[in-house]
Every structure is written in structure tokens, then in C-alpha cells.
Amino acid sequence: MIDPLQASVRIATSGLDAQSTRLRIVAENLANANATAKAAGAEPYRRKTVTFDAAVDSTIGARLVNVKEFGVDSSPYRVEYDPGHPAANENGYVKLPNVNMLVEMADMRETNRSYEANLQVVKQVRSMAAMLIDLLRGT
Amino acid sequence: MLESLALSTLNTIGDSLRTRQVQTSALTPASAATQPASATATAFDSVMGQLAKEAVTTLKAGEAASIAGLQGRASAQQVVEAMMSAERSLQLAISVRDKVVQAYQELTRMAI
């Protein structure tokens, strides 16, 4: 039986890890927001998504969050008229990645908030553990 | 786990106090008194040794995690978690040690 405070830290850390991975995906989407194909009519970058899953950790007997899988967003690509582009099709249209900057920014903010919340749990655990140990210090 | 260790430490101190009380109230001869006194000394030694071992184990885990982090094998979050756990164990070990030493000093100052 593990100390519940220690288990809380472990769980919060899994949350921190998960949100870090999520931020990585957001960064990838943002960086590739204008990554078009090289050849005419080929597919550009497709927006990636990340899904989380609750997995039971038998050593602490609690559910940790971990990354279930990386998926792809199947929404249609943005299309822009640019006949001079190497990836333009016969009608002069270029397919751009289906990355929406606003959506990515909102996702990033949410990631940040969730990370903060998990970090707050860690801080709380530290303060509670310190309070407990301080009981021994007092004369 | 360490909390239970601390509790057992305090219990041991209580036991040793009780042994001393029995010794002083019974006014046993010096030859007979050496036996329980040495038993308490061993208990004290083992408690302190166990405490140190516990603290060293968690500290080692923390160090291993930070080295893994430097080598890129562990995430920063995992390193922080391990270091926090090590810090907590060390703090607890130090507090318990202080308490035990204090109790021991209390015993040595006792007027017989």
C-alpha cells in the first residue's frame, strides 16, 4: 500500500506527461500549418490529434492518464488559388494543411491550464507533506 | 512506509524509556542491568541504521532519475517527481533523527 500523497504526485506527474505530449502535437500542427506537398495534386500535412486514456497502475492502485494514440484529423484541406505553386493542380488550386491556427491556439491554452492544474496538485502535496513533517520539528 | 517507520521509532523510544524505568525502580545490580541496556543500544542502532538506509535508497532513486533525465531517458516531470520523493524522505529522516537524538539526550540527562 503506497502513501496516498505519493500516489497523488505519481498521478499528477502522469497528467503533466500527457499534457506535454499534447503540447508536442500542437507544436507539430502549428509548425506544419503551411506545409504543402512537393508534387502537383499531392496531399499536404494532415493535422494530428492526440487522445488520452485512463490506465490502471497496479503498483499504486490508481488510474493514471496516458496517451492512447495519435490520430489524424480527417476534415477537408484548405484550398487556395495559386497557379504558380509547385503543388498546384491542373486548375491552379493548392491544397493546404487542415490546420486551423485558432483551434491550435485554443488547444494550447487548454493544455497550459491542464498542466497548471496538475502542477497545483504537486504543490499541494508538497505543502501537505511539509506540514506533516513539521509536526516532528516543533518542540 | 516512512510514516510507519517513524511510528515504530517512537515506539522503540517508548520501550527504551520503559526499560530504563524498570531498571531504575528495581534497583538491580550493575551486572544484571548491563543486559537490557545493551539490548536498547542495539535497538537504537538498528533504528538509526534502518532510517539511514531508507533515506539513502530514496536519494539514490532520485539521483538515478536525474541522471536518466540528463541522458534524455526520462522526462523532466519524472525527474522532478523522483527528486521530490527523495527530498521528502530525507526531510522525514532528518526530522525523525532529530527527534530520536533529542529523546536519547533526554535519557542521558536523566538524573538517576
PLM feature spans:
Chain A
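Amphipathic alpha-helical polymerization modules
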Residues: 1-139
